[in-house]
Amino acid sequence: MGHQDTKLGIPFLLAFVLLTCLAPPAWCVASTAMSRPNAGAGPTPVNIYIYVADIFDVSGSEQAFDADVVLVAEWRDPNLAGKWTERQSARLEDVWEPRLLLVNQRGTSALLPQRVEIEPDGLVRYRQRWSGSFTARMDLRDFPLDRQRFHVQVVSLGYSRDEVYLIPDPEGKRSRRAEKLSITDWTLGPTRMEIADFETAPGMKALAGVQLVWEGKRQFGCYGVQVILPLIMIVLMGWTALWIAPSMVMPRMSVSITTMLTLIAYRFALGRLVPNLPYLTRFDYFTLGSTILIFVVLLFVAATAYFVERNKTTLAERINRWVRLAFPVVFGAVLILIWRV
């Protein structure tokens, strides 16, 4: 009886195997296409296209920019060629894929499902859109007249260039950025694709990678009106102390000290614009020069008060007159030296 059950079970087992092979694409793909295409014939070529759909913000204090980035990757898998007569869709984990990773992403979210399209000739196409923050190493010495270099770098995780050859946009037409962007305080230049392998650690084999690169220039108008102009007005407020008669000691001291404290508070309020840096920016030099200039005015105000108290009013007025004339000349020189392009 048991022998007959075994005979009856064999046809059912064969039928199950046959149905498995004729199942939907995801089933068959998983069983036949998990090995790297052309593994014995050199590196597998993968075409990479990167499109920056939008840029929302550039943060100097965080050394990052917020953007929407679209990635398209295409490669040919001979194991999948000829299996279907029409385009098929499959899960990403059911086919071999180059394990693409955004190197400089910081807290991005994938917006599309992890799927691929398979053409009848074996062409596999993967699309994904990421939204979030990307790191950007910035040189802020010229802030806020600085130019920066931005990039989005993609690598093949676990594969060197000997195994996977990432080709940056062979046609040179599909990798670019959108013409209209949300960001308003930067002027961005054209993009270009380039090979950029990623070294995970010193001495380790570099991962195959490419990147989309573009440069940007900060628009000075916004900072000139909202930051620099108010600071100039604060400095000129300190100059008014020199237009008060040297005999009016308390009003002169009050204006000078108030200007000094306002400058210090203003500098702390604007500290969020840039990170803590081992060097001074143009803006730092400007605030430092302005603070020193107001401090010198404060010293001269104190000196003239000393001479007035000792009945040397003529000397105090002479000193005050020369300092009052020299102030705009020195301040103008500071402006020219620091803000010259």
Language model: regions and residue ranges:
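Short, low-complexity, charge-dense intrinsically disordered segments
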Residues: 1-7, 17-20
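Short, Lys/Arg-rich cytosolic juxtamembrane segment immediately N-terminal
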Residues: 6-10, 217
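Sec-dependent signal peptide hydrophobic core
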Residues: 9-14, 323, 327
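Bacterial N-terminal signal peptides
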Residues: 11-25
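Soluble non-transmembrane domains of integral membrane proteins
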Residues: 29-215
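Intrinsically disordered, low-complexity peripheral segments of secretory-pathway and membrane proteins
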Residues: 29-79, 272, 279-341
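C-terminal ends of transmembrane alpha-helices
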Residues: 163-165, 190, 268-269, 336-341
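Channel- or pocket-lining gating/hinge segments that regulate access to a cavity or pore
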Residues: 211-330
